[in-house]
Every structure is written in C-alpha cells, then in structure tokens.
A protein has these predicted regions:
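A solvent-exposed, acidic/Ser-Thr-rich amphipathic alpha-helical stretch
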Residues: 16-68
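Short, aromatic-enriched amphipathic alpha-helices that serve as compact interaction elements
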Residues: 1-16
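A short, polar/proline- and glycine-enriched secondary-structure boundary/capping micro-motif
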Residues: 83-85, 113-119
Length: 121
C-alpha cells in the first residue's frame, strides 16, 4: 500500500477503531514534552490509547508524504472524562516500514492547554 493511503487509513482507524492493528512491535514514540524516545508497541498503545480514548473526531487538515514518512496536521475534537470539550491541533510525524506497519510516531501539541482541559479549567 502506498504511504499516503496507509496514513489516511490509520487516521480513519483512529476515528472508527482498529488503529492498534497498524502498530509494529518494534516501535519508537516521541512526544513534545520530552526528548526521550519511548520504545515498544505496548508503550505506544498505552500512551496513544489514553489520548485516543478522548477523541470524538479527528480531522486531517494537511498531509505531506515523502517516501515512507508522513507529516500531518490534525485537529482533534476531544471530550474529557468530566465532559469538557476541546479542539486541539496536533502535528504528527509518522514512519511506516516496508511491511506497511507504523514503526515511529512523534507528536507535538499545546501541552499546557491540554493539561488545563484535563483539569477542567
């Protein structure tokens, strides 16, 4: 499958379910709040899973593809456990391997705004 179609399919699965099927066992995960690269599928499934559980809808605003790498600007409509809602723009950088599995993801977003949202402010 071509990389653009893979990325679109992954983001569709974030909305509809099944995104976990895209993730390789050998996975690198980076976040904007740390320079540490977390490794392993389970780490990503836990971290992304907590975030995606808040997702009401993901809209891909811009998608750039080069080889097996993707840069995406996405808008997430989130709902907190307390019922608060937030639209959050997230820059996501993905990498797929030759077997069409997602092997790396690094995300950037306004962590302060997200923390306030989660605290009900």
């Amino acid at each position: 499958m071509d990389t653009k179609t893979l990325a679109e399919s992954y983001f569709t699965a974030v909305n509809k379910g099944g995104w976990e099927e895209f993730v390789a066992e050998n996975f690198n995960y980076g976040m904007c709040d740390s320079q540490e690269i977390r490794q392993g599928r389970d780490v990503y499934l836990q971290g992304a899973g907590q975030f995606y559980a808040l997702n009401q809808h993901l809209e891909v605003k811009k998608l750039l593809v080069e080889g097996r790498e993707v840069a995406a600007l996405n808008r997430y409509r989130l709902q907190s456990p307390q019922g608060n809602q937030l639209e959050l723009d997230v820059a996501e950088f993905l990498k797929f391997d030759e077997s069409d599995k997602l092997i790396a993801s690094t995300i950037y977003f306004d962590t302060h705004r997200f923390q306030e949202f989660m605290q009900g402010k």
